[in-house]
């Protein structure tokens, strides 16, 4: 579920893997492995992505389908 969500969010925001990888301070090849599910994405990077896309961690991990981030 995480892999689909991070890829969909990236594409919905018209971003390349390289752009997101730069935000996460990792190589594009590593980020690509996260999207394909070949590597498990660390929690600290999920937190950065949730803040970047303004979605909840629950959305990223598939616990909810509600994208909105509630403060």
Feature map (PLM): residue ranges:
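A short, Lys/Arg-rich alpha-helix, primarily the initiator
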Residues: 1-12
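Short alpha-helical DNA-recognition segment
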Residues: 15-33
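Short, charged recognition helix plus adjacent turn
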Residues: 12, 61-71
């Amino acid at each position: 579920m995480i892999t689909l969500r991070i890829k969909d969010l990236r594409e919905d925001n018209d971003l390349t893997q390289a752009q997101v990888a730069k935000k996460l301070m990792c190589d594009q090849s590593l980020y690509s492995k996260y999207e394909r599910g070949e590597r498990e994405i660390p929690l600290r990077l999920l937190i950065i992505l949730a803040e970047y896309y303004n979605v909840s961690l629950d959305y990223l991990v598939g616990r909810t389908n509600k994208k909105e981030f509630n403060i």
